[in-house]
Amino acid sequence: MQARFHTSWAELPASLQFALEPILSAENFPAMLTAEQVKTVKNISGLDDDALAFALLPLATACALTPISHFNVGAIARGKSGNFYFGANMEFRGVPLQQTIHAEQCAVTHAWLRGETNLVAITVNYTPCGHCRQFMNELNSGSELHIHLPGRPPSTLGQYLPDSFGPTDLAITTLLMDPVNHGYTLAETDPLTQAALNAANHSHAPYSQSHSGVALETTNGKIYAGRYAENAAFNPSLPPLQAALILANITGENCASIRRAVLVEGHNAVTSQWDTTLATLNALGCSAVKRVTF
């Protein structure tokens, strides 16, 4: 079991520990539970979906990376597939606070990167800020996404964000988590570049059409790819680097262990991820950063 879970693990009920131990002790635990694992854990622990999501929050919170605020937030995104996905907030020294990732953004993006195509609920240990409410408003779940908070009855996103502005106001019909493939190609055969290209092809950028993807290679040779997630309100858009860092951190990778990185984007796109990607990666200690355009 990863060391970051030890403190939270000790506080779990014995029945839940018994149910989760084989899952969390796996060498490459991906910070998610499959639908089958969720079913098994519920049968052993006696918890239902809502109670299990709340019980998992301390483990998700243990994934937080907060060198600035030291305020850890965890989230569990529940997919229509039945899978549960961990999320936690992430902060980075030496770059603007705008590069911060909120726990809800992390859980949603984690689910998206794992292939989830629709969310039914998100459970979080603190009320979602306005930024996160707007970010989630881009989802194909729409205002019916259920939000669960400790000590409160479940509410919908529509109740947390009344009279919202979203994709439909801009006549956008392809929503975040809808399956897409933009069909871009590159001649380069480098696996890291191809991973970034694949991410760009599945990115969500209906407002600028500036599709982009980032792939990170760590010192142990693992590759983590992230896609751009654009938002109708523009500012809550999540850059592809942040998506890649989400996948790396949530699975237990050290974000300071990135050996090289590739950004793939359009050569004449109206917005570019290059400057912020380079600056953030440099702050994390990675200088081998490459930009490839289609």
UniProtKB/Swiss-Prot annotation:
**How would you classify this enzyme at the top EC level?**
hydrolase
Q: Does this UniProt record's set of keywords contain Metal-binding?
A: yes
* Annotated active site: 104 (proton donor)
Q: Which reaction does it catalyse?
A: cytidine + H2O + H(+) = uridine + NH4(+); 2'-deoxycytidine + H2O + H(+) = 2'-deoxyuridine + NH4(+)
Gene3D superfamilies reported in the protein's UniProt record? Cytidine Deaminase, domain 2
Cofactor binding summary note: Binds 1 zinc ion.
Its Enzyme Commission number(s) read: 3.5.4.5
Domain CMP/dCMP-type deaminase, chain residue ranges per copy: 48-168, 187-294
Q: Which GO terms describe its molecular function?
A: cytidine deaminase activity; identical protein binding; zinc ion binding
> A single GO CC term, please?
cytosol
Q: Where does Zn(2+) bind?
A: 102, 129, 132
Q: Cite the record's note on assembly.
A: Homodimer.
Listed name of the protein? Cytidine deaminase
